């Protein structure tokens, strides 16, 4: 079979391009008939990359990191889009599909602090940089005395900002730091019991057009089954909640033998209440388990987790 050029769409940050390169290598490894020169990576600047000083919720939400890339995919300017799954809205875009995932990296959160100080040894009223409502509330659960402050930008930008006087520490995803080769910067790795991660954290997602059979047959060979099941459960929970970047929600699924386990946390909008739900079941019922988790969290929280607009 003769193949034309396959264009992979990606954000332009160093980390995003590493994700795209990883996806490209995986596609080539699992499709030996493809010549490496057939796959090209195209950088697409997203709204989230352009506006790096405001909260995502103030300028349009999670789709800011994916909408421009999806437009290119729908217009057939690219054939595949590579995303960090945690950046994708829970509702899929019409005529596009996200159901191929590379093997999940470590989903835990990490702390980078000045002078390499442990989280629990930071001085009273230290300022922690984060761009996530979820992290803000989880930090407050662990230490009410700490101050959280918005920080935006890519990993290098955030580390650079830490060198100034605004922040004493920042919290980031371990997967990104590891991928960038900056593990030596880590002051502490949080357990998932301390800080439950964002839905989809550590997962690279590959998106395509639903009706593009040739491309879908190529990319399905790289799909990691366990990661797929975990993503299915976590994202279904988020979908039921109608969760967006204003929703302080965490979720982590794991597969052990023939069972899937899903741990979830949801915070009220004022951060005063935390709702917890853990569920497990047969791994082939991942979506159903995610749905049940979402419904249970709503039954506990009511509308307390939503901003009245």
What positions do the PLM features span?
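Small-molecule-sensing regulatory modules
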Residues: 2-52, 58-59, 66, 85, ...
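N-terminal glycine-rich phosphate/adenylate-binding segment common to multiple enzyme folds
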Residues: 61-100, 106-107
């Amino acid at each position: 079979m003769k193949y034309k050029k396959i264009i992979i769409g990606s954000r332009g940050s160093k980390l995003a391009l590493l994700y795209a390169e990883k996806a490209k290598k995986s596609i080539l490894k699992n499709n030996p008939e493809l010549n490496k020169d057939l796959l090209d990576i195209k950088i697409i600047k997203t709204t989230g990359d352009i506006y790096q000083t405001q909260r995502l919720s103030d300028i349009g939400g999670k789709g800011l990191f994916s909408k421009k890339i999806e437009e290119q995919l729908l217009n057939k300017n690219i054939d595949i889009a590579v995303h960090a799954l945690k950046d994708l809205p829970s509702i899929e875009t019409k005529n596009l599909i996200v159901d191929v995932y590379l093997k999940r990296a470590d989903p835990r959160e990490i702390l980078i602090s000045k002078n390499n100080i442990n989280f629990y040894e930071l001085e009273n009223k230290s300022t922690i940089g984060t761009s996530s409502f979820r992290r803000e509330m989880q930090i407050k659960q662990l230490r009410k005395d700490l101050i959280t402050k918005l920080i935006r930008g890519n990993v290098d930008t955030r580390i650079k900002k830490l060198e100034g006087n605004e922040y004493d520490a920042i919290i980031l995803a371990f997967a990104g730091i590891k991928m960038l080769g900056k593990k030596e910067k880590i002051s502490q790795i949080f357990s998932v019991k301390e800080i439950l991660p964002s839905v989809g954290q550590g997962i690279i997602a590959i998106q395509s057009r639903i009706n593009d059979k040739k491309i879908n047959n190529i990319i399905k060979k790289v799909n990691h089954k366990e990661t797929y099941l975990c993503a299915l459960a976590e994202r279904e929970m988020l979908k039921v909640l109608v969760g967006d970047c204003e929703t302080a929600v965490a979720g982590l699924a794991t597969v052990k033998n023939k069972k899937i386990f899903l741990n979830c946390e949801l915070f009220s909008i004022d951060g005063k209440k935390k709702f917890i739900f853990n569920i497990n079941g047969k791994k082939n019922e991942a979506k159903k388990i995610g749905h049940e988790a979402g419904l249970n969290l709503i039954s506990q929280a009511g509308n307390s987790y939503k901003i009245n607009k």
